[in-house]
């Protein structure tokens, strides 16, 4: 089961796989609020953690898809231990990378060893052929005299000939085991970036039915109103997100927000609350100007939700 950490009314999802599962299987997108490690000074693209609306977190808890837990408060006395643990893990990662790099280089060297030996043999054979061709062009008498001086009476090669052979072999590189592998510089090593945070050991389950410091939404009329509408739209197959900058409660999408634009700006109104005409006109004009339809949502005592769509039509 997925885990959602709740602290001070904010519901956070820290795992990348959990975020993917919420979007693909449950139709809950949330909003990323974390800075990217390689782009911390911008806010156009954000990363983990994922911030859920209170209505999203409650819905997931009600259907049994997630477990809400209260995140433990950080203890400043443990910061030094956490930093030391992080540095140990980083050093271990660097050592593992150097070990893998050395193994890869040794494997590559073994693959090329046969080609190196063949190349050395071909080079040696070519030098011997060139030397034989030069000697064949000399006079027969001179060749016999030279041959007689290089060999002794018993047919053994002379000391000069013995010394020439190893000098030929030493002129070309000899394949053999490496005496050692130079470690990679720190600038060439990769720094592992965590994509998830382990579940806190001391985390305790959170009851969303009871109001607490971490979950102050329980029992609030505004939250109950928004939740009833959110769940009804979600059960109809819509994706929803926050719509604060559009003057509404939710943006309603026909599918994944990564593929579709929002079609509606949902405003939640209680059935007995009057709607000021000025707010109604301004919301309708705003929705039309951004090519969206204003959706007035009001839950009824029998549990059903009444929807009224509104578009502003200018005078012709």
Curated annotation (Swiss-Prot):
Active site: 253, 261, 292
An MF annotation (GO) of this entry: tRNA-intron endonuclease activity
Extent of Polar residues compositional bias: 144-159, 168-181
EC number in record: 4.6.1.16
Region described as Disordered: 120-184
Main location: nucleus
GO cellular component, one term: nucleolus
Cellular localization per UniProt: Nucleus; Nucleus, Nucleolus
Gene Ontology biological process: mRNA processing; tRNA-type intron splice site recognition and cleavage
Catalytic activity, reaction form: pretRNA = a 3'-half-tRNA molecule with a 5'-OH end + a 5'-half-tRNA molecule with a 2',3'-cyclic phosphate end + an intron with a 2',3'-cyclic phosphate and a 5'-hydroxyl terminus
Keywords associated with the record: Lyase, mRNA processing, Nucleus, tRNA processing
Domain of life: Eukaryota
Subunit-structure text: tRNA splicing endonuclease is a heterotetramer composed of TSEN2, TSEN15, TSEN34/LENG5 and TSEN54. tRNA splicing endonuclease complex also contains proteins of the pre-mRNA 3'-end processing machinery such as CLP1, CPSF1, CPSF4 and CSTF2.
Biological function: Constitutes one of the two catalytic subunit of the tRNA-splicing endonuclease complex, a complex responsible for identification and cleavage of the splice sites in pre-tRNA. It cleaves pre-tRNA at the 5'- and 3'-splice sites to release the intron. The products are an intron and two tRNA half-molecules bearing 2',3'-cyclic phosphate and 5'-OH termini. There are no conserved sequences at the splice sites, but the intron is invariably located at the same site in the gene, placing the splice sites an invariant distance from the constant structural features of the tRNA body.
Similarity-based family: Belongs to the tRNA-intron endonuclease family.
NCBIfam families given in the database record: endA
The name this protein goes by in its record: tRNA-splicing endonuclease subunit Sen34
Organism: Mus musculus (Mouse)
